[in-house]
C-alpha cells in the first residue's frame, strides 16, 4: 500500500481500488491529477496482482480477501480525518459495491469507472461454459484470461506500455474466475442494499471487457439522491486511459469538488489544475 499526499491544502482523500490483472503503477496520471488538485491518494495492489505474493498470482481464496484490503486502506485514509472517497475501476468497482451491500463504510462518496458487474460474452472470455464442462478441477489450475492490451484503451501509448509491463497478469485460476462470476451475480441481486451516497458512474460505450447493460441496470436500481452519470461515446474499458483522459479527469475532479463544496470546502469553478 502507498500514500501520496496532495501538493497543496487537502480537500479530501481518495482510495483507489484497481482493476483485474493490473497494478498500482498504471495509475500515475490519475494519482498526479488528484494530488495537484488537492486530494491525498491511498492505493495498493489487490491480492494476487502487482507486487503481491508471486505464489498467489491470479488467485484468491475468497472474495472477502479483497474486502479486507479495501477496509485496510480506508482505515488509513480515515486517519487524515478529512472527507474520504473511493474510486473503483472494473474489479475495484465490484469490490466496493459488494462490500457496500454488506456494511456501511465511512466515506462521503464513490466513483465507479466501468464497474465489473457482468463480463462481455464473446469467444475470448466466455469461460463459464468451459468451466462448467470441466467439472471438478484444481482451484490452482490457471487459464489465459484473454484480455488483450488493445482491448482496454484506444490510447496506443498506453497499449504499448501495457504490452511491455511485466507486472500485468495474463493468467488466473478457474477458482478466481468462478469467484468473480458468483460475486457479480450476488452483487446485481442486492443492489437495493447499497447505502445511498453521492456517486459518479462512468463507462465507455465501446467497452470490450464488461457488459455495459449490467451497468445501466445498476444505474436504474441503485437508489441515491445524487448520481452523476457519463457514458463516454466511443471509449473503451479504461476511460481514464483514453486519448481524451484529460476530459475524464476533469469530470472526476468536478464531481469531487462539487461534493467537498457541499460539505463546506469552498472550491472555485476554474480551480482544476491540468498536467
Pin down the residues of each PLM region.
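Catalytic active-site module of serine/aspartate enzymes centered on a nucleophile-bearing elbow/loop
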Residues: 226-275
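Alpha/beta-hydrolase-fold enzymes
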Residues: 89-167, 171-172
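Alpha/beta-hydrolase fold nucleophile elbow
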Residues: 78-90
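Short alpha-helix in the alpha/beta-hydrolase fold that links the catalytic acid
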Residues: 211-220
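Short beta-strand element of the alpha/beta-hydrolase
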Residues: 11-19
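Short beta-strand/loop motif that positions the catalytic acidic residue
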Residues: 201-203, 207
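Catalytic nucleophile-loop/oxyanion-hole region of alpha/beta-hydrolase
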Residues: 21-23, 50-80
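Conserved alpha/beta-hydrolase
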Residues: 26, 31-55
Amino acid at each position: 500500500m502507498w500514500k501520496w499526499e496532495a501538493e497543496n491544502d487537502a480537500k479530501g482523500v481518495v482510495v483507489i481500488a484497481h482493476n483485474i490483472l493490473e497494478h498500482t503503477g498504471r495509475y500515475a496520471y490519475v494519482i498526479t491529477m488528484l494530488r495537484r488538485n488537492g486530494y491525498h491518494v491511498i492505493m495498493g495492489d489487490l491480492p494476487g496482482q502487482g507486487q503481491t505474493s508471486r505464489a498467489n498470482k491470479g488467485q484468491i481464496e475468497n472474495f472477502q480477501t479483497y474486502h479486507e484490503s479495501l477496509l485496510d486502506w480506508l482505515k488509513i485514509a480515515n486517519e487524515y480525518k478529512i472527507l474520504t472517497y473511493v474510486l473503483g475501476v472494473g474489479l475495484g468497482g465490484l469490490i466496493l459495491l459488494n462490500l457496500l451491500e454488506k456494511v456501511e463504510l465511512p466515506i462521503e462518496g464513490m466513483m465507479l469507472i466501468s464497474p465489473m458487474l457482468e463480463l462481455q460474452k464473446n469467444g475470448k472470455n466466455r469461460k463459464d461454459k468451459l468451466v462448467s464442462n470441466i467439472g471438478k478441477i484444481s482451484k490452482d489450475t490457471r487459464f489465459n484470461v484473454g484480455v488483450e492490451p488493445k482491448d482496454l484503451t484506444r490510447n496506443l501509448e498506453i497499449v504499448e506500455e501495457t504490452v511491455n509491463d511485466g507486472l500485468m497478469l495474463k493468467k488466473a485460476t478457474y477458482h478466481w474466475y468462478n469467484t468473480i462470476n458468483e460475486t457479480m451475480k450476488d452483487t446485481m441481486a442486492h443492489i437495493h442494499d447499497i447505502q445511498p451516497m453521492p456517486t459518479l458512474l462512468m463507462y465507455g460505450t465501446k467497452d470490450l471487457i464488461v457488459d455495459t447493460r449490467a451497468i445501466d441496470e445498476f444505474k436504474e436500481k441503485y437508489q441515491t439522491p445524487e448520481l452523476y452519470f457519463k457514458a463516454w461515446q466511443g471509449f473503451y474499458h479504461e476511460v481514464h486511459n483514453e486519448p481524451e483522459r484529460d476530459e475524464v479527469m476533469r469530470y472526476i475532479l468536478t464531481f469531487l469538488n462539487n461534493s467537498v463544496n457541499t460539505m463546506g470546502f469552498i472550491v472555485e469553478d476554474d480551480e482544476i489544475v491540468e498536467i
